[in-house]
Amino acid sequence: MANGQVPSWQTDGPQIEEDEFLIELPIELLAGKIYLNIEMGGQPRQFVLDTGSPSMISASLAAELGLQTVGKSQGVDAHGVTIESNIVQAELGLGGIRLRNVPMFVADFSSSAAAQCLLGDGILGSEVLPLCVWQIDLPDSTLRCASRKSQLDHLRGSSQQKLHSYGYPHTPYLDTQLAKQAKSKAMFDTGSAPLFVISPPDLAGTQRVGGIAGYVYGEGSSGTSLGGKSPNRRQQKAAIKRLAIGNLKLGKVEAVQRDLAPSLVGSSILEEHVVTLDSAAGKIYFDRYRKRSPQRSSFGFALSFDGGTQVSLVWDNSPAAQAGLEVGQKVLALNDIPADSSCPSIRDALTSLQGDSLKIEWAGGTAELKRP
């Protein structure tokens, strides 16, 4: 490829064959991730809808379908680890429409039990956003893709905000107000569960103008991505006094700090709003269906699943910390269900963490945790 030349796999697609369409696809939410079925090779495949990522396909499925490498790309994962990937182009079936020449990063999920379980066959990512008007409707468990905005409900009376995109892979960004004198942009990332995850520059700017009400600290890893588990270190959450997306006020929000910019608006916002993205027009719509409520408290710990189920993060003074949980402890059972690295066990564990109480057994103790 000549220096500065845009690779053909970025310009050839993706494309939709049909001119006029409205499709509705059933979706399922688990641990903040949105699952849907996509047809590839004549079979339904389970994908994750992740607006904060380019589209990906598991190496095993790419091999099964005989997809040819059309390029390579280098990027960083959520924790800053450099990842080099082969690129393939694929045809996808979504309801009654066909997507052609979709560029997909080939990823080996098999090296991580959690990735293999939770990412399934791949990711439907941000480069498909300009192809139609997308609507994520959790109350109806439906993802819609419409050729025209006028085909959709949930727009009249909704909060219309600006949606920014800066070329391939068409990652969506939103205007955010973190304090009276602190404005920024955040990625709309449905692959991230928390309502808001704050970047170091945004945190510093918000703190400087008095927009932070306080901090909560913890110890452990900020999570696992394709480049592996991030190292254990001191972690912090910041209570933002008043957060807004454009003029959509979200009020006081507790935000975990991430390692990199930008900040993220995550899938938790879908638990209160039907969200419609019109990338071509640069607009996003939030139709509130549930009254804004205080953020739900947590048990105060997180799990990792590679090499067995282990405690990966504990927040200070939380129910988990008070019960004696420590980073690195092996978890034996959750709600009396044995914990291991199998996919059913991982899904059971993540479901258990959504309850109001949790019985946990680990190597060294047992406790009944309740949300504060």
What spans do the regions from the language model cover?
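Pepsin/retropepsin-fold aspartyl endopeptidases
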Residues: 1-372
